[in-house]
Amino acid sequence: MKKQKKIRNIKYKDVINLDRTIARFILPRLKFFKKKTYTYPIGFTIEEWKSTIDKIILAFELILDDHEPDFGNLKYHTEKSDNGYWKMIEDPNSTFDKEAYEKWLNDKDIKIKEGLKLFADNFQNLWF
């Protein structure tokens, strides 16, 4: 068996959530780029280009945003099912608004995907 090369200066904590590590690196640079850029790619106006950069920035901000709005209190208990596995049962007194939570999560996911697609599509335009 071939011995794996050891990579120096890479910490496990930086790789366990690589998406967040990359976002933390890219986000401040994108903000600086937006502030300093005075050029824009062919096919864009300066307003369209800055709007595109804003959507990209928003995607990376949302990746790093751990805050969740209050959707109520999720209460549940566990019961053993007939097949021997434990299952979670939502308590009837739970005030958690599952529909609002799923809508919020879906909206966030759509914005992240849109921004990351714009990032990929315009990666080679990130210069001035």
Feature annotation, model-predicted:
Residues 1-125:
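Long, non-globular targeting/processing and low-complexity regions
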